[in-house]
From Swiss-Prot:
Taxonomic source organism: Escherichia coli (strain K12)
Xref: Gene3D superfamilies: Dipeptide-binding Protein, Domain 1 (3.90.76.10), Dipeptide-binding Protein, Domain 3 (3.10.105.10), Periplasmic binding protein-like II (3.40.190.10)
Record keyword Protein transport present: yes
Similarity section: Belongs to the bacterial solute-binding protein 5 family.
Subcellular location as annotated: Periplasm
PANTHER family named in the record: PERIPLASMIC BINDING COMPONENT OF ABC TRANSPORTER, PERIPLASMIC OLIGOPEPTIDE-BINDING PROTEIN-RELATED
Protein name: Periplasmic oligopeptide-binding protein OppA
Length: 543
């Protein structure tokens, strides 16, 4: 990415201004705009959620709702920069000891105050083996003191380096200086959770009537596979500047159905992926309602690195080379995506990546090299490699899986069997490692290369490629020992090169965020590359 240093300085300036001025993020209704009498919003969320417990979730659909229900120390502003949430301000000593100063008017939906101890309880719960959080290793990326030993079962959760100095002061001690630590705290897994409700209701604490939240909204209704309805929380500290009273999330997996219900007036915002076959038609017919924006995500095929024959780097490399990204991007997807050559998008803040040699080859040369590698591994036209390709229910993922299977067959003679699973089962299968190759997409939790790279560490709970590389782990450990930004950037490049050398995944393309938004939905900008969209920032214009 060009101009990284300048962008980082600008982001730092925005952050400093937010902290100094204690800016409250909420719906900003321009002068002269007449609001609709009925302030309700209907959004498609793409699938039924895995859970509403911030420590039990790992996907985008769950995070979309969690941002409305729970508020962490920090939130994202409209441009994707970290901004004050429950924490009004924060400071640090040598990027190792961080102190967060909490709002005194932050409350739970039951009216009780949100305190620093709530964050201590939440973070300890997130790393507790009994919680079995898929994001258990997330705080490890921030290198909080004691986290490694806790996750290894060598220390109790009470040894985690987080403590409440008083009700409104939280101190976090890291084992290593991490200058970008504050960026991690926008993620839902770092939100506070209600101890009393969890202890009273157990696994059912997230049900309507039981749940207690501290965000701008609380849960009104949840009909599995039909809808989740949230209503405005009168106890939210900035409720006076919240406009939308109710938001409904629908679990529609089909992009075509999503668009059809949008055009019939049932939905105000579609999910962030539009049907391939309808995209150009929609751009022509309703151009002002089509929003295509940068999105910090990578679409890839995840190879089970531990399962034979995929534990052979020659097989993995052949699959990587045999994927024709130009056809996927230009003929199948055709929505402005960039072909991917690595895991971390090149436009990530703090990244300065170099394209691998193979990316400059023609597809014919890639295919030729892939066939040689397969032959070396024992696979020929008479004895072809056969793989199962797993994808979760979605029109888009199905079309891409069909295209990928066709390309691998045509280009390098690999036979592919397609396997479809619903979202929750799909996630479990990947974690359990009972698959060959799976459709995957990783969207950054914060705008920094480690949000991608850390998920490939051998001990990461998000490493569903089951990739184990001491060399990669060593490079990532080195990033914590340098304070110079240029040196750290060079190490990120080296880490990406190691992933490419090992062909840990098959990168396909870098996402764009493509969705339909009704003209009467105000406050949606699409400028946040993390797509951290908060309902509290939006409003409905009279129409």
């Amino acid at each position: 990415m060009t101009n990284i240093t300048k962008r980082s300085l600008v982001a730092a300036g925005v952050l400093a201004a937010l902290m100094a001025g204690n800016v409250a993020l909420a719906a900003d209704v321009p002068a002269g705009v007449t609001l609709a009498e009925k302030q309700t919003l209907v959004r498609n969320n793409g699938s039924e959620v895995q859970s509403l417990d911030p420590h039990k979730i790992e996907g985008v659909p769950e995070s979309n709702i969690s941002r409305d229900l729970f508020e962490g120390l920090l939130v994202s502003d409209l441009d994707g920069h970290p901004a004050p949430g429950v924490a009004e301000s924060w400071d640090n000593k040598d990027a190792k000891v961080w102190t967060f100063h909490l709002r005194k008017d932050a409350k739970w939906s039951d009216g009780t105050p949100v305190t620093a101890q709530d964050f201590v309880y939440s973070w300890q719960r997130s790393v507790d083996p009994n919680t079995a959080s898929p994001y258990a290793s997330y705080l490890q990326y921030g290198h909080i003191a004691g986290i490694d030993e806790i996750l290894e079962g060598k220390k109790p959760i009470t040894d985690l380096g987080v403590k409440a100095i008083d009700d409104h002061t939280l101190e976090v001690t890291l084992s290593e200086p991490v200058p970008y630590f504050y960026k991690l705290l926008v993620h839902p897994s770092t939100s506070p959770v209600p101890k009393a409700a969890i202890e009273k209701f157990g696994e059912k604490w997230t049900q309507p009537g039981n749940i207690v939240t501290n965000g701008a909204y609380t849960l009104k209704d949840w009909v599995v596979n039909e809808r989740i309805v949230l209503e405005r929380s009168p106890t939210y500290w900035n409720n006076a500047k919240t406009v939308i009273n109710q938001v409904t999330y629908l679990p529609i997996a089909s992009e075509v159905t999503d668009v059809n219900r949008y055009r019939s007036g049932e939905i105000d915002m579609t999910n962030n992926s539009m049907p391939i076959e309808l995209f150009q038609k929609l751009k022509k017919e309703i151009p002002d309602e089509v929003h295509v924006d940068p999105y910090l995500c990578t679409y890839y095929y995840e190879i089970n690195n531990q399962k034979p024959p995929f534990n052979d780097v020659r097989v993995r490399t052949a699959l990587k080379l045999g994927m024709d990204r130009d056809i996927i991007v230009n003929k199948v997807k055709a929505q402005g995506n960039m072909p991917a050559y690595g895991y971390t998008p090149p436009y990530t803040d703090g990244a300065k990546l170099t394209q691998p040699e193979w990316f400059g080859w023609s597809q014919e040369k890639r295919n030729e090299e892939a066939k040689k590698l397969l032959a070396e591994a024992g696979y020929t036209a008479d004895k072809p490699l056969t793989i199962n390709l797993l994808y979760n229910t979605s029109d888009l993922h199905k079309k891409l899986a069909i295209a990928a299977s066709s390309l691998w067959k045509k280009n390098i003679g690999v036979n592919v069997k397609l396997v479809n699973q619903e979202w929750k089962t799909f996630l479990d299968t990947r974690h359990q490692g009972t698959f060959d190759v799976a459709r995957a997409g990783w969207c950054a939790d914060y705008n920094e290369p480690t949000s991608f790279l850390n998920t490939m560490l051998s001990n990461s709970s998000m490493n569903t490629a089951h990739y184990k590389s001491p060399a990669f782990d060593s490079i990532m450990a080195e990033t914590l020992k340098v304070t110079d930004e240029a040196q750290r950037t060079a190490l990120y490049t080296k880490a990406e090169q190691q992933l490419d050398k090992d062909s840990a995944i098959v990168p396909v393309y870098y996402y764009v965020n493509a969705r339909l938004v009704k003209p009467w939905v105000g406050g949606y900008t699409g400028k946040d590359p993390l797509d951290n969209t908060y309902t509290r920032n939006m409003y409905i214009v009279k129409h």
